[in-house]
Regions:
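Glycine-rich, flexible N-terminal cofactor/catalytic loop recognition
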Residues: 1-60
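A contiguous loop/helix-start segment that scaffolds small-molecule binding in enzyme catalytic cores
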Residues: 3, 79-80, 159, 163-285
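Short active-site oxyanion
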Residues: 27-33, 107-111, 159-160
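General beta-strand structural signal in soluble alpha/beta enzymes
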Residues: 36, 110-115, 162, 188
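Conserved helicase motor
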Residues: 57-66, 139-142
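Acidic/polar, glycine-anchored loop/turn motif associated with catalytic or activation segments
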Residues: 83
Length: 285
């Protein structure tokens, strides 16, 4: 019996011309194609001129727990299971990592057919440092959670990449300006590799001004990747006590508990939480 395996197969993020020969071969010959959306997978195959010989089955966040065991059983039986997301690399903010973890835990083979990724494409185009970076998934939706996330980046020495919805982009950038400062370097990458690809680079204030104007005039559409540059060297500890107290107040007003806000701001600036807490209480009178 041939040895089964799982293959994580990266798919184009917008331009079908980026599909590799290996991806075409996998889609044509895999025994099973585990797809985030079976309709999207079938459209991809049609666009590439590929006729799958295997079954196309759903494997997404809502059925991942249930479908994982079935896919592992197929691999045990000698099947090649190709895992594809709607766009880009499976497991990167997409379904698949639980399947990989489960396969690894029982010793089943897992390999990868690498290819396009919105994360690394946006990073490369941003013009921001690429030697150290972090991917933070999606920008938090709720204002308080978003502010806490941005507060954690006050002294972040790495470039940070995150996904954002076009409808929330202008509001998110306004909070970037408020929390990280108008001069923090930022990049917004929209519709990467597609016909209307757009990359906007500048300070947080400049990019926010672009987003606010575009949102008001015609709306912002398409897939968005937000890239936030690292803090300026020596940023840690630069904030005065008054600045830190003000940052705590902003977080508390947005719904963060006082002790959590103090811990976040103190950690970002290398301050002692107890001393900052006392300063906040003193400022409140």
């Amino acid at each position: 019996m041939p040895e089964g395996r799982i293959v994580l197969a990266a798919t184009p993020i917008g331009n079908l011309g980026d599909a590799s020969a290996r991806l075409r071969e996998l889609l044509a010959e895999a025994d099973v194609i585990a797809a985030e959306d079976t309709r999207t997978a079938r459209r991809l195959c049609a666009g590439l001129g590929v006729t799958p010989t295997g079954r196309v089955v759903a494997h997404h966040e809502h059925n991942e727990a249930a479908s994982t065991q079935g896919l592992l059983d197929q691999v045990r039986g000698g099947a090649t299971v190709a895992v594809v997301s709607d766009a880009g690399m499976p497991t990167v903010s997409d379904p698949g990592y639980r399947l990989v973890a489960a396969a690894v835990s029982v010793g089943l083979p897992v390999t990868c057919a690498p290819g396009p990724s919105a994360v690394t494409t946006a990073l490369a185009l941003s013009g921001l440092p690429t030697d150290r970076f972090a991917f933070d998934g999606f920008v938090p939706r709720k204002d308080g959670e978003r502010r806490r996330w941005l507060t954690s980046l006050l002294t972040e020495a790495r470039t940070v990449v995150a996904f954002e919805s076009p409808q929330r982009l202008a509001d998110a950038l306004a909070v970037v300006v408020e929390v990280l400062g108008a001069q923090r370097p930022v990049c917004v990458a929209r519709e990467l590799t597609k016909l209307h690809e757009e990359v906007v680079r500048g300070t947080a204030a400049e990019v926010h001004a672009w987003a606010a104007e575009r949102h008001a005039a015609e709306g912002i559409r398409g897939e968005i990747v937000l890239v936030v540059g690292p803090a300026a060297p020596g940023a840690e500890g630069e904030a005065s006590e008054a600045d830190a107290v003000a940052e705590v107040a902003v977080l508390v007003e947005s719904g963060t508990r006082l002790k959590e806000a103090v811990a976040a701001v103190a950690g970002a600036h290398g301050m002692r939480s107890r001393e900052l807490y006392q300063a906040v209480l003193a400022a409140r009178g």
